[in-house]
Amino acid sequence: MIGFRAALAAVIAVSAALLAPLEARADKLSDIISKGVVRVSVFADVPPFGSLNANRELEGFDIDMAKLVAKAMGVKLELVQVPAASRIPFLMTDKVDMNIAAMSITAERALQVMFSAPYADTSLAVFGSKSLGVASGADLGKNRIVVAKGTTEDLVLTALAPKADIMRTEDNATAVQAYLSGHAQLLAANSVVVVELAKRNPDKEFDFKFALRRAPAHITIRRGEHDLLRWLDTLIFQSTLNGDLDELHRKWLGGPMRPLPPM
């Protein structure tokens, strides 16, 4: 009997040691619900996804999407403003729980973060004045093209035209300002964002030159948080069925939600 008890005690001790790391590392979904707050990184300079209104309040498609997430979780929402290049670093250093800032998927990014199902449909392209005869990456020549560093358009443009005169800025607002002021002849940006820019800057031409790629937006989280990812996918599926995402597309993107490609 003593031998049996000693063996049982040893098994229990080993089991406790194995389970301890799992218990110490709470899963992110449970952690958010336990704390009662979800921290979401968003843009403050990329209308209509995220920008500051006249009252200096954040508004836009991604802001409303973050509110939808917080409401469905039953927690408070903490919005964290980030430039494009800081979206993944903020996730990796646990400054935010998730990123909802018009991020499109790439294989390189997937080495660092996990992507939810797509929640918004957009595309990336190059724009400039009507007088510029640019119809592809091969036509860029000596024309300087500006892009926000770390964005998908930066990655695609660099691969497409590595020898082009690419001006990379720290954030989207600076990239737009460089184009508006004439420091760059072309702008690589999200087509939905450019529609909004054209409305706000009627004296500047935003003529479509060529497409870079279709770029649906995804919520991103840290790798390994599978429970949170499954929950986000469920929310996006539900919001597609009940019309919430279509409503956001009509409100912010100017039209109905098109069918999005599966992951």
Residue ranges and their predicted role:
Residues L52-A54, A66-V75, S116, G137, ...:
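Ligand-binding cleft/hinge of the Venus flytrap
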Residues K76-P83, V147, A164-A175:
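Short beta-strand-to-loop elements that line the ligand-binding cleft
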Residues S86-P89, M103-L111, V156-A159, L180-S181, ...:
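A ligand-binding cleft/hinge motif common to bilobed small-molecule-binding domains
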Residues Y119, G128-I145:
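Flexible hinge/capping segments at coil-to-helix
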Residues A120-G128, T174, S191, V195-F237, ...:
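Periplasmic-binding protein-like
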Residues T152-T169, F206-F208, I236-M263:
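Ligand-binding clefts/hinges and TM-proximal coupling segments of bilobed small-molecule sensing domains
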Residues D27-A102, L111:
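Extracytoplasmic small-molecule ligand-binding "clamshell" domains
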Residues G36-V42, G137-T151, D165:
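Short loop->beta-strand "edge-of-pocket" segments that line small-molecule binding or catalytic clefts
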